[in-house]
Amino acid sequence: MPVYQYKARDRQGRLVEATIEAEDLRTAARLLRDRGLFVAEIKEPGKGLQAEVRIPALERGPGLKDLAIFSRQLATMLGAGLTLLQALAILERQTENRKFREILKQVRTDVEGGMAFSEALSKHKIFSRLYVNLVRAGETSGGLDLILDRLASFLEKELELRGKIRSAMTYPVIVFVFAVGVAYFLLTGIVPQFAQILTDLGSELPLLTRFLIAVSDLLRAATLPLLLLAVALFFAYRWYYGTPQGRRVIDRLKLRLPVFGNLNRKTAVARFSRTLALLLSSGVNIVEALDITKGTAGNSVVEEIVEAAKLKIQQGDPLNLTLAQHPFVFPPMVSSMVAIGEETGALDTMLSKVADFYEREVDEAVASLTAAIEPLMIIFLGVIVGMIVAGMFLPLFKIIGTLSVQ
């Protein structure tokens, strides 16, 4: 069945640009009018040079941002009194990501067929176990709009947290890559020319200069093998991290890195606290909540601690005791606040406070890390370039000094 592109306005005057499947143009226009849309433009899919080029492998799949926007908009529409099917139909039309639009279409079709919303979501990987369980809790309690609002806030905070971590990591990586590029250019393009000049002059070369010439010769002779080695090491790392033992070793190292380890630990505590608080406040029992939280930890060391806590709770021990046994990941303040929450029956509230505190800690850590890394990266770049320049010009200065004496 052909797919038609259209532009239309809804009853509120908002512009809607999307596609619709129909047998012909007349049917497509009628279907749009039945949806309450005022059609401004509708056209057949392009043919030949006008056809839209789509490469499935390069199309962006739905991500966390799409899910956060979907949750926020769905919560707003349900809170305004729209039915679930009406809200899903609207979101399906206005979603820009094509793959996510197809997912929403399948979800809407399943719900129309009598399937529970949570069950329809569970058929698609974009909706995590956490998401599906919270939606199920919302369906059971009759407060789906409130649950979706909490989910939207949770996903927005997670996006913000990831953005801060990414910003902290991006600058040093960019400077490092730039430094490597400059060093490669100097060593393979400039150093050989100086080496030829110095060889022709027949002067004795300092150790630093001989070292740079040796590195230059190696890079020019073995650039391709070195690139292949780097690619092989990358895939070897991916394979090793894919094994249970490798993931445990690398994840433990991530938590113990000199500078970034502290940031990773604070991020892990913030994510654990925020996720568990959301689940508990939505009515999920603590054993199931811990099991779901374990899957969102993103670090096998934290996953093992959460799994141990779940088993201890099943045996009758409180959560704070297990956390207190791992002060390197969960500081005493966390276990103490969890203990107070368990004693007062307000564990979800205490966990939210812990999450707020550690999200602020992450903010401060990222700010201080960025402030510290910037001058260090500039110094690093200066040392690399300065060492190469010094290695090349020292023999020239020596030759000039010898000639001036003569």
Swiss-Prot record:
Biological processes annotated in GO: protein secretion
Matching InterPro entries: GspF/PilC, T2SS_GspF/T4SS_PilC_CS, T2SS_GspF_dom, T2SS_GspF_sf
Localization per record: Cell inner membrane
Pfam families (alphabetical): T2SSF
Keywords: Cell inner membrane, Cell membrane, Membrane, Transmembrane, Transmembrane helix, Transport
Keyword Transmembrane helix: yes
GO cellular component terms listed in the entry, alphabetical order: plasma membrane
Transmembrane segment boundaries: 69-91, 171-191, 211-231, 377-397
Bilayer disposition of the protein: Multi-pass membrane protein
Keyword Cell membrane applies: yes
Family: Belongs to the GSP F family.
Chain's role: Essential inner membrane component of the type IV pilus (T4P) that plays a role in surface and host cell adhesion, colonization, biofilm maturation, virulence, and twitching, a form of surface-associated motility facilitated by cycles of extension, adhesion, and retraction of T4P fibers. Controls both pilus assembly and disassembly and plays an important role in PilB localization to the complex and ATPase activity.
PANTHER family from the UniProt entry: GENERAL SECRETION PATHWAY PROTEIN, TYPE II SECRETION SYSTEM PROTEIN F-RELATED
SUBUNIT field: Homotetramer. Interacts with PilB.
Protein name: Type IV pilus assembly protein PilC
Origin species: Thermus thermophilus (strain ATCC 27634 / DSM 579 / HB8)
Highest classification ranks of the organism: Bacteria, Thermotogati, Deinococcota, Deinococci, Thermales
